[in-house]
Amino acid sequence: MDRSEIVARENPVITQRVTNLLQTNAPLLFMPIDIHEVRYGAYTLFMYGSLENGYKAEVRIENIPVFFDVQIESSNTNQLFLKSLLTAENITYERLETLTQRPVMGYREKEKEFAPYIRIFFKSLYERRKAITYLNNMGYNTAADDTTCYYRMVSRELKLPLTSWIQLQHYSYEPHGLVHRFSVTPEDLVSYQDDGPTDHSIVMAYDIETYSPVKGTVPDPNQANDVVFMICMRIFWIHSTEPLASTCITMAPCKKSSEWTTILCSSEKNLLLSFAEQFSRWAPDICTGFNDSRYDWPFIVEKSMQHGILEEIFNKMSLFWHQKLDTILKCYYVKEKRVKISAEKSIISSFLHTPGCLPIDVRNMCMQLYPKAEKTSLKAFLENCGLDSKVDLPYHLMWKYYETRDSEKMADVAYYCIIDAQRCQDLLVRHNVIPDRREVGILSYTSLYDCIYYAGGHKVCNMLIAYAIHDEYGRIACSTIARGKREHGKYPGAFVIDPVKGLEQDKPTTGLDFASLYPSLIMAYNFSPEKFVASREEANSLMAKGESLHYVSFHFNNRLVEGWFVRHNNVPDKMGLYPKVLIDLLNKRTALKQELKKLGEKKECIHESHPGFKELQFRHAMVDAKQKALKIFMNTFYGEAGNNLSPFFLLPLAGGVTSSGQYNLKLVYNFVINKGYGIKYGDTDSLYITCPDSLYTEVTDAYLNSQKTIKHYEQLCHEKVLLSMKAMSTLCAEVNEYLRRDNGTSYLRMAYEEVLFPVCFTGKKKYYGIAHVNTPNFNTKELFIRGIDIIKQGQTKLTKTIGTRIMEESMKLRRPEDHRPPLIEIVKTVLKDAVVNMKQWNFEDFIQTDAWRPDKDNKAVQIFMSRMHARREQLKKHGAAASQFAEPEPGERFSYVIVEKQVQFDIQGHRTDSSRKGDKMEYVSEAKAKNLPIDILFYINNYVLGLCARFINENEEFQPPDNVSNKDEYAQRRAKSYLQKFVQSIHPKDKSVIKQGIVHRQCYKYVHQEIKKKIGIFADLYKEFFNNTTNPIESFIQSTQFMIQYFDGEQKVNHSMKKMVEQHATSAGNSAGNPAGNALMRAIFTQLITEEKKIVQALYNKGDAIHDLLTYIINNINYKIATFQTKQMLTFEFSSTHVELLLKLNKTWLILAGIHVAKKHLQALLDSYNNEPPSRTFIQQAIEEECGSIKPSCYDFIS
């Protein structure tokens, strides 16, 4: 069944109507999905999408004018001069037209408002681009000068959205298989203003399953034996989750199912070709998968390349254009597309973009919707949305079923694969992804592809230009090319009032916020580039003529920046571009929110089974999508105005907005203080205010005259909240009237959001409390939290639980007559319970997440990933599976725990086991599999104590001296130190570790003194050897004999050291029989050898004396080598003195770790006797025969 048959089956009535319209050449509705340009030769724009009934359609738009504008000094400038410039550069153009427009930068008075421009028309984009580059280099200002995507300019000029219904008129029509082809001119396209009918575009959701014979690894398309063995697809209407058809293409026999059609292929090559064939039959408008841009598409493309069929596959999938392989790889295989996830994070996508089908990776969409999600798997996102989960089928079982070719089990694999595809569509529909992106495209005159793959800034730019170029906004000429020097620096910071830290249990605190501060400032003060006045002389001249100006000044990069903006004084004709656009967006959103409210009320009254419920639900979703798109643009507006890479960037405007925000918050602050209110905290756009005590006098007196029960106290708190709400409502109205008088407009307003009571401020942007919005609500389980670490991404359940316990306990209503425990007491009580009662914590409480960003200097993650890389390499050497230690994709989050390492000390009692986080991190799966112990103390010290310190750092004992600049940091550090000592006092294991360290230090001090005595004796003996010139050999032998006597057998030394350790460890109250005691003995003996190495270094430095000694020995050895191929024997002739000396040398040099010296000379001896030395095994055998068994053998010297 192909697409046309599905459409006819599902939509027979609409299909008949569309057929009749086609036969009579009547106007048709068309929904564009994908856009492609023909940029060579005559410019042509292709739009792909569907007709009203779901037929696949291609709309070819011809005769699109190709032009750009260039500003000239005066209208009298002869066009011949511009023609001569272009001709001199061999730039071919069609014609020139003169017009007038308003430049976007700088204020121009009424009589000089418009400037002359010349519009230059071309036959091709190539010549246009050459001309733009040339004239910009010559210093001319250009407009309508898009150089990357010309279709955006076409959309703006024609006011033709690329993501909503378009009416086709006066078209020429040609059916072509599954595709209905139309040819039109720009005049034949009419934007359809109504919502239009239900969209019947088709979505194909798919999933692939891959196999590798190397167990435990992720299949790699570059490995010949790794294959894709199954591809499952489901198609849907774009708005529905009910499948229209399903197909499973497999290389292993699969039991038939009524839920899908099975296609059995004999090879991977045939499977890929079948996928392309099925793709072409359904001709989807959108192709979607989960993480397919990171895995599925790269796998399919790479395997198609290996089989030499990528060109054939592309041309099967593309119903419109057939291309050669090099063109496919260059223009249609998007190998690295950076997709913005959040302000800090981007992700690389790869996909095959066939004309007419838009690829969408559902994982990328979900990550944009949940930028702080700690888990980004399909299962996690389904759980977040409350959708049915995916099927649980481990990979090792799937691969086993594929290897055994069990048809019933392969049916389970097919079902698993099909359901994964189904869940992709479920997520797209649940999140209203396509309608939301379409509304953004309608507002910004960009394509659906732009709305999915580009950040918000360029869409705001495009929307601004679309508003600017039309008559109702003054025909402002806008360029898309950023000009001028781009400076980097900080704009004026926000006005901040330091919080009054601590727990407030007596008076409610109310938040007063500016509504959309920066957009409101732009509307109030007429911040817009074409309203900017740069010089004081011009500003004075304008004010003398009666103009009202808003002055801005601020410091930027150590200089004063100043300027003026001509105010609109509420006169529409005087409003700048930015305020006009924002006011239009605001009015539209207000109307939509009102409609949304009415639709929501209707939804509440109608049951899901009602015939009109689905239509109502659809309408509600569409209106919601429109108001969301408007909100996105309003919130992104200032970001683009302050972006120094934007063509609209103006430094005085960007800094002027923030400095005006400072001014207005200070204004409100002073107004509120003068009214007798108190300020708890203020930052950027909000103030937290307390009412005067007199407001509560009456209700407080009533409580004091009551029996003061807890019920009476709760009633008192209830009435205080109500009084605060009423007072704040009045204050808010007074503040807004005060602001209106100050700035002359009603755009800048504050709103009362909530009353917080009780409330606790712990730092800047860090506070929590019980929020009362419409009515009092003292539920401690629903806290209002801002900036506290428990809501921080990556935090463990342990930290969240402890933090929540502290906050909930501190929010309980307590009468003044009762004991009100201070925060420090609450923190210590909760912390003690957490530390002492360790059994209450489960493994899951310690799981945390982090992001792998190779370019970021996150030392712990870098160390951890380095360790995992080393593990993978080690396992690969032994042919073992290493997938459990796989490195995440850059930007991807991964889960881990901190595990406990054995406590170790050096000889001086210092901890030698690594305390670095990166050395203690382990993947969750690995820690679970090996049952590794969790380092609970690490979590307490490194995560929990910092959080707990935040609650108590306002205590007097933690406050810094007056000369400390960063008082909050100082207090936080002191509070954390205090809690660390508290934990050490209650944690038994920590005390044990400290005790072990003390014992080590005591033992070291005693034993080291004994070692030094012995070393002194050895040093004196060898000094005698160096100074004895008459008989150095005899002196050396005597020194060696003494050393052998002292170190005769490692056991004696160990035994001696053990006795010393036991004696002093026992006296210090520690058992030497434990592992730590044994480790201490090993460490002490190692230190002994280390001290002796100093003598070895002295010997090495006396190299000449050693060389003479060894030369004497060598010259007295008759070293004969027979032909070992025949005799298989090596003969030595030693005197008894020489053998004894060799034995002594062997033991002495080994003990002194001087093998490197002996090895150097003895190896030289071997090399001098034979150009081709015997094999190592042969030498070892010969020496053992002649010298007997020496442990360690003399072979160690030679080899």
From Swiss-Prot:
The keyword Transferase applies. Induction: Expressed in the early phase of the viral replicative cycle. One of its GO terms (molecular function) is DNA-directed DNA polymerase activity. It catalyses: DNA(n) + a 2'-deoxyribonucleoside 5'-triphosphate = DNA(n+1) + diphosphate. Keywords: DNA replication, DNA-binding, DNA-directed DNA polymerase, Early protein, Nucleotidyltransferase, Transferase, Viral DNA replication. It is an enzyme of class 2 (transferase). The keyword Transferase applies. GO terms for biological process: DNA replication; viral DNA genome replication. Its EC number is 2.7.7.7. DNA-directed DNA polymerase involved in viral DNA replication. Consistent with its intracellular location, ASFV encodes its own replicative DNA polymerase and three base excision repair enzymes: a class II AP endonuclease, the repair polymerase Pol X, and an ATP-dependent DNA ligase. Belongs to the DNA polymerase type-B family. This is DNA polymerase beta.
